[in-house]
Curated annotation (Swiss-Prot):
It comes from Aspergillus oryzae (strain ATCC 42149 / RIB 40). One of its GO terms (biological process) is ethanol metabolic process. One of its GO terms (cellular component) is mitochondrial inner membrane. The keyword Mitochondrion applies. The chain crosses the membrane at residues 12-32, 52-72, 129-149, 151-171. May be involved in cellular response to stress. Required to maintain mitochondrial DNA (mtDNA) integrity and stability. Keywords: Membrane, Mitochondrion, Mitochondrion inner membrane, Transmembrane, Transmembrane helix. The gene is sym1. This is Protein sym1. It is found in: Mitochondrion inner membrane. The keyword Lyase does not apply. Belongs to the peroxisomal membrane protein PXMP2/4 family. It is a multi-pass membrane protein. Its main location: mitochondrion.
Amino acid sequence: MFRWYQAKLAKQPILTASVTSAVLFGSGDVLAQQVVDRKGLEKHDFARTGRMALYGGAIFGPAATTWFGFLQRNVVLKNSKATIVARVAADQCLFTPTHLTCFLTSMAIMEGSDPIEKWRNSFLPSYKANLTIWPLVQGVNFSIVPLEYRVLVVNLVSLGWNCLLSMINSGDK
């Protein structure tokens, strides 16, 4: 299975990352609804899961793949440790606020609610939660994970993170 995934990544990296992101964003929402909230299938909000999967596949997968490539090519310092710190800082100060803003506002639009209000209520809790885990994850990711697998690593860690994001987005803080 892993070799098949490697072949797909080599041949179509953005498409592969997008499909992976869609599946894992949707899975994070299923975890939020079924494991955390214990809604059961009869009360499961399938539209919410679909919105999460759509965002993961259409926005996050392509954006993260492009972003990691950009960092790899453009954030290169003389010292490898400084390079990692600079990449993590860029990721947390540039990509993360942009990603969270896109996530929160696009979810609000798809839900038919006010995107500005959603951003005002949810951005800071989401960003604070992000800072508790992602700088460390990305430090490890940028240190030891080859470029082509970085989105996969983020997606695997994101199972729990997307569960949290989905709960914050739904007001289940």
